[in-house]
């Protein structure tokens, strides 16, 4: 899948799940299951419930995503 095929949306972390997975509530009201991208994991950036994040969604499965940025 090409990098420019992804859909980027903003949301808020609602719940922390095992294995670095998170339930993220998007601004449009939907809830997606998201995992942490490699760069965030590599730099030990902590993500807690209530944090505002950017999520990349695949156009093929809009229920799963990847957290690519945590706002300060």
From Swiss-Prot:
Phosphotyrosine, modified sites: 60
Keywords of this entry: Cytoplasm, Initiation factor, Phosphoprotein, Protein biosynthesis, RNA-binding, rRNA-binding
SUPFAM superfamilies: Nucleic acid-binding proteins
Function: One of the essential components for the initiation of protein synthesis. Stabilizes the binding of IF-2 and IF-3 on the 30S subunit to which N-formylmethionyl-tRNA(fMet) subsequently binds. Helps modulate mRNA selection, yielding the 30S pre-initiation complex (PIC). Upon addition of the 50S ribosomal subunit IF-1, IF-2 and IF-3 are released leaving the mature 70S translation initiation complex.
Protein name: Translation initiation factor IF-1
Signal peptide residue numbers: none
Locations listed in the record: Cytoplasm
